[in-house]
Design a protein with these regions (language model features):
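Conserved short alpha-helical segments that host acidic/polar catalytic motifs at enzyme active sites
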Residues: 1-253
């Protein structure tokens, strides 16, 4: 099965359930050489995060290409996955300290993203910001929140829980429409919960391999587009209870 997001999803977040447990995946693809020559780091315990880094460590820092893609609170299992560094700290704290502030973190996250807007990497075709949250403590309102921010001030959001999703079902959101000459992702599919796929994966490694393997399109101009896939299942193993697996195009020792 090809990637359900098309030949070029850009950056793609999937969230759902595997073996009755919360699960996520983050897939990275790119067209330019600098976008392709990146990798996902192992889990970095000082940061409690996984970063997308350049292969060449002497390469100049680029905030649109080099960032924390996954962040986990080791105590609660709160997980954030995003293609953009800018909103991460504020949104992560909105969820982590919601009991202290007594404010709705879903609403606050939507406001933060709306105020920032899309990434400013391209004036004509800016890249959308996509973000997913898994809050294992929020069973009542639903453990998953997902966000798509294309143009200011309009953003799109969904929320759902483990009790409303079939096992093996993954909802996804992505930066682009799936075409190599990209446009915006169809937000109507997203908000109607129609951007979803079923997986046979049983483990995070299965999920990472499945998504990475299905994204094997080779473009005549840009070549191989897939870069990396990070996947996780909250089965009690790993940081915050998340067992993590990573599939990189390039091996980094």
């Amino acid at each position: 099965m090809p990637n359900p997001g098309g030949n070029y999803p850009g950056r793609q977040i999937a969230m759902g359930a595997i073996e009755g447990k919360p699960a996520f995946a983050y897939f990275v693809s790119g067209r330019s050489e600098k976008s392709q020559k990146r990798y996902a780091t192992p889990f970095l315990y000082p940061e409690h995060a996984i970063r997308i880094n350049p292969l060449d460590m002497n390469e100049k820092f680029d905030q649109f290409r080099h960032y924390q893609a996954v962040r986990i609170d080791p105590e609660t299992g709160l997980l954030l996955v995003s293609n953009s560094q800018a909103p991460n700290d504020a949104i992560f704290e909105a969820y982590k300290f919601k009991n202290m502030t007594k404010e709705d973190p879903f609403f606050r996250a939507a406001i933060i993203l709306s105020s920032i807007g899309p990434e400013y990497d391209n004036k004509q075709k800016p890249t959308a910001r996509v973000l997913g949250i898994c809050d294992p403590s929020d069973i009542e309102d639903g453990e998953f929140d997902m966000f798509l921010q294309t143009k200011r001030p309009y953003g799109h959001q969904i929320g759902f829980g483990m009790n409303t999703i079939a096992d093996g079902r993954m909802h996804f959101v992505q930066t682009y429409d799936g075409n190599v000459d990209y446009g915006d992702f169809d937000y109507t599919m997203f908000v109607d919960h129609k951007s979803a796929f079923d997986t046979s994966a049983k483990t995070p490694q299965d999920l990472a391999e499945e998504i990475y393997g299905s994204s094997d399109y080779i473009d005549p101009t840009y070549g191989v587009l897939r870069v990396s896939c990070i996947a996780g299942v909250r089965n009690g193993n790993g940081p915050g209870g998340w067992e993590i697996a990573i599939k990189n195009r390039y091996r980094v020792d």
